[in-house]
């Protein structure tokens, strides 16, 4: 039976019921709805709606229902209830009779669902942060094992300057750290309890909402009832954070796909995260990484959809807001799956020390070192930049690396170049000189790894 049937003289058409009902997806809020109902039952005691004995009967029945839900959440879908709130109430009435009908006193589904989705989001933030820390730890571990693996760094997908594989790993640690921080910021803003806001104007019962918030593990009660039932900022914030983090994961996946390609051959992905071709027996495809890359649009689409849902809504609650759930459920599930899969991809990765070094030696990635060398000899940087550019053109023409040119050849472009130039053109020198904080020098990378290990203990 619908919770709102008294006003109506005709039965709901089945076509509308199928269109309107949300149990098929909001069943995922069952635990939160039950926990919120237990909290509300305690609050009703303080305003003499329930006796202590009645509250205990309700709490026992709700706790029993919670155990049933946790053991088999899919069982909920066998019911014909309109939504999860209707389902919980009907099951409670089945267990305790008419006493169950008293629970909704002073409460609206508007503040009820606002509570449920906030509680669910808070729980998912904690789970996502745990998964992100696991990925960060795996990146740090991979970096630690590959500190001396030299590879080309790229701009415009052209070889630019030598870096290490460890430095590459630590770049993604930093990206994920910002994502983690954004989750923490969002958590703090969503940590306010809307229960007791009623439909929009607040509950008519003198409930201590701060005590209720504390009982439900919120930092405080919301300050405005109208805003409380209208607010879906926390969903949009999480979708925004998820979208940005998925973009980071997509960049990681793209790098791995390139590094794993036959053209680069820097890394080999495990058989456990790759697949083959139905036609070409030699193929080993990086499907895990490609799927991470491909799922970004799905998450960004959920963000865009939610923004469009709320952009024109008048205060307070509107049924449009039912559209918040499927998007956030799917987006955060997808995000967590991708974070976990990225961690799995790194578990058995093999890095080719020889191939990465060979690639780093090509492409004249030590050109900047030669320009800096000339600056140290008193040549203005703009002039040195031009001199090195001409030198590279010559080196390409004669099929030599800069380090292979003779002093006589160097002197065609600048007499400031002397025998000591060869010391600074080595890959190791290129790395060592980048010794400012955050740079690629082995010392700085080792410091970054050590610091990250302390943070992620």
Swiss-Prot record:
It comes from the Bacteria. It is found in: Cytoplasm. It is an enzyme of class 4 (lyase). It catalyses: 2-(N(omega)-L-arginino)succinate = fumarate + L-arginine. PROSITE patterns: FUMARATE_LYASES. The keyword Cytoplasm applies. Its EC number is 4.3.2.1. NCBIfam families: argH (TIGR00838), PRK12308.1 (NF008964). This is Argininosuccinate lyase. It comes from Histophilus somni (strain 129Pt) (Haemophilus somnus). The gene is argH.
């Amino acid at each position: 039976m619908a919770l709102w049937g008294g006003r109506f003289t005709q039965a709901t058409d089945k076509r509308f019921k199928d269109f309107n009902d949300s149990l098929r997806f909001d069943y995922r809020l069952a635990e939160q709805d039950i926990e919120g109902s237990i909290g509300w039952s305690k609050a009703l005691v303080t305003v003499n709606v329930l006796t202590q004995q009645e509250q205990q009967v309700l709490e026992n029945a709700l706790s029993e229902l919670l155990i049933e839900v946790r053991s088999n959440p899919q069982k909920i879908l066998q019911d014909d209830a309109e939504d999860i709130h209707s389902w919980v109430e009907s099951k409670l009435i089945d267990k305790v009779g008419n006493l169950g009908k008293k629970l909704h006193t002073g409460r609206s589904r508007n503040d009820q669902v606002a509570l449920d989705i906030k509680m669910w989001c808070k729980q998912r933030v904690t789970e996502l942060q745990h998964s992100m820390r696991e990925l960060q730890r795996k990146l740090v571990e991979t970096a630690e094992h590959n500190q001396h693996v030299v590879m080309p760094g790229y701009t415009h997908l052209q070889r630019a300057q030598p870096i290490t594989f460890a430095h590459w790993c630590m770049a993604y640690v930093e990206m994920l750290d910002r994502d983690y921080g954004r989750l923490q910021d969002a958590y703090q803003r969503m940590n306010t309890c809307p229960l007791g806001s009623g439909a929009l104007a607040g509950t008519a019962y003198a409930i201590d909402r701060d005590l209720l918030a504390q009982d439900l593990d919120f930092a405080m009660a919301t300050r405005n009832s109208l805003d409380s039932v209208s607010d879906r900022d926390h969903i949009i914030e999480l979708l925004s954070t998820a979208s940005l983090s998925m973009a980071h994961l997509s960049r990681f996946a793209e790098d791995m796909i390139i590094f794993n390609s036959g053209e680069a051959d820097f890394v080999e992905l495990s058989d456990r995260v790759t697949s083959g071709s139905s036609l070409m027996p030699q193929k080993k495809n990086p499907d895990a990484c490609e799927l991470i890359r491909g799922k970004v649009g799905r998450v960004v689409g959920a963000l865009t959809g939610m923004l469009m849902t709320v952009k024109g809504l008048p205060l307070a609650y509107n049924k449009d807001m039912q559209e918040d759930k499927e998007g956030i459920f799917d987006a955060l599930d997808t995000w967590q799956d991708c974070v976990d899969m990225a961690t799995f991809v790194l578990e058995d990765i093999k890095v080719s020390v020889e191939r990465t070094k060979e690639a780093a030696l090509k492409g004249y990635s030590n050109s900047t070192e030669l320009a800096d060398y000339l600056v140290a000899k008193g040549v203005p940087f703009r002039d040195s930049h031009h001199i090195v550019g001409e030198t590279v053109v010559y080196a390409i023409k004669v099929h030599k690396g800069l380090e292979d040119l003779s002093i006589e050849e160097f002197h065609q472009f600048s007499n400031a170049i002397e025998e000591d130039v060869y010391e600074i053109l080595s890959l190791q020198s290129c790395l060592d000189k980048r010794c400012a904080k955050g740079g690629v020098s082995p010392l700085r990378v080792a410091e970054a790894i050590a610091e990250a290990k302390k943070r992620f203990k």
